[in-house]
Amino acid sequence: MKNQHTENKQLPKLVVILGQTASGKTDWSLYLAKKFNGEIISADSRQIFKKMDIGTAKTPGEWRWDGFKKTYYVGDIPHYLIDFLDPGKYFTSAEFHDQAIKYTKLIHGKNKLPFVVGGTGMYIQSFVDNYKMPRIAPNKKLRRSFEEKSEMELLEWLKQVDPISAEIIDQKNKRRLIRALEVSILSGEPFSSQQKMGEPLFNILQIGIKKEKEDLHQNIERRIDEMVKLGIVEEIKSLLKQKYSWDLPSMSGVGYRQFREHLEGKETLEQALEKLKKETKHFAKKQMTWFKRDQRICWSETVEDAEKLIEDFLKK
């Protein structure tokens, strides 16, 4: 769906690097940001959380003073919207939209090129199309009634009130199911129909990383094996000890919830890992289903292809 959002040459430019989990976004974005004097805004709904590094495959970095504020650096590249939120807190797509716009303007103010990098499709689309998002406050009473339902029961309910969201949502993520239902019920409109495009703010090039399924699955398996070596089980135990519960948004995502039965003595570690590998591959498939809806994305197999796309984009 072509529209003026990516074609308005008068607007400030930015580049989006998107792709499935374990597709190589980090390496590409660091190389390209260095090449084109850029800074990075993370569009990853899991890497926003502090204390959650291994299960989110967060890019190792450090907080440094940058003028009067601290900024997360990976090497010499500043990163925003990463490692900043307590795991007990909530962060909506609407909040991401607002914060990403703020940091994009900050980066432009330094005469640098903003790179928005991640795999959270809702974050990216809300930003690219300047969505006017539903601002429905969480309803504790409604949420308590939802919590008593299983994921399958919630999904069946969502299919009735919002079949579009039901098709593309992470069906094992109870938090997201609850939020989609909550917004649909309290507003009286399907969650998926409430995201309206606003006026374009930026001239945007979207680059997607194209990865063969077999290669991607090998990357996923390697990453999960590495997570165990790095101490994912110990990371989760530490979070539970700090009273972060399994029903929090931070703990209900891929990379964490799959270890619950193991830590409760109901599964072996090997069973938990097999489940994580299977569900991560399914999650990657869902990501691609989301991205394929946007015909404006330029798919690249190599970082050199992406580099050429950016060079041409900046010349226009």
Q: Where do the model's predicted regions map?
A:
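Phosphate/pyrophosphate-binding catalytic cores of soluble transferases and nucleic-acid-acting enzymes
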Residues: M1-K316
